[in-house]
Amino acid sequence: DFVIIDFEGEPRLPLSERTSLLVGGRWSDAYFEDTEAGNQRLTGTLGLERRMSERSTLSLNATAERVEFDDESVSSNYDRQSGYLEYAMQGARTNLSVRAGGTVLHDYGDTTNGPLLNLTVERQVTARSTLTLNAGTELTDSADALRREQQIGGIDLDGGNPIVSTDQFQSDFVSLAWALEGARTTLDLAVDLRSEDYERDTTFNRDAIGATGSLVRRLSARLSWRLYGGWSKQ
C-alpha cells in the first residue's frame, strides 16, 4: 500500500498581451507500507510562455526538485533539474501537448542525465467520449511513476503491482485511454506499456504491459457504485 499527498499551485503572471510568466510549486509526501522508501519532495517550476495563436502556445520551462528520504541510511537525498520546451495546441476536437528537453540528477556526488520527452494527444471522438494517447521517456522514481499510473488508469485502491525502490530509473512509456461520460454512467478503459531501466539495482529492470477498466454508475446525487478491474504482465 502507498499514500501520496500533494499540495500544488501554478499561477500565471501576464507580462504582455501574448507573453506570460509561469511560476509553480509543489510539496509532496510519499509513504510506502513495509518499506523505507518514503520521502518528501519540494518542486519549483519557472517558465516563459508565448501565445502563438488563439489556440496554441510555446513555452520554455525549468524545474528544480529536492527529494529527502525518511531514512537517509537507506538512500541519499538528491536534487533533480529539468529543462524543456513545450508546445500546446487546443483544436475544436483535438488537444496536443509536446515536451522535449532533458533531466539532470545529482545524487551524493554522482550526476546522471537523461532525455525528457512527452507527447499527449486527446481526441474527442463523440460528444461524450474521448481518446487519449500518451507516450514519452523520462528520468523518474517510484513516487512519480505511481502518480502517472494513477492519472492514466484512475485510482487503484490495491495499488496495482508497482516496484517500490529508492533508486531512480529511465522510464519509457506509451498508453492509450478511452473515456465515456454518460448522463449517469462513466466508463474508462486504458492500456499501458512501459520499460524501466534502473540506475543502480538493475535486477529491478522490467518491461511491463497492463490494462485497466472502471465503470461508475450514479444512483442518485449522493450515491454511486464503482466496478474496477486491472491486469498486468511483466
Features from the language model and the residues they span:
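Gram-negative and organellar
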Residues: D1-Q234
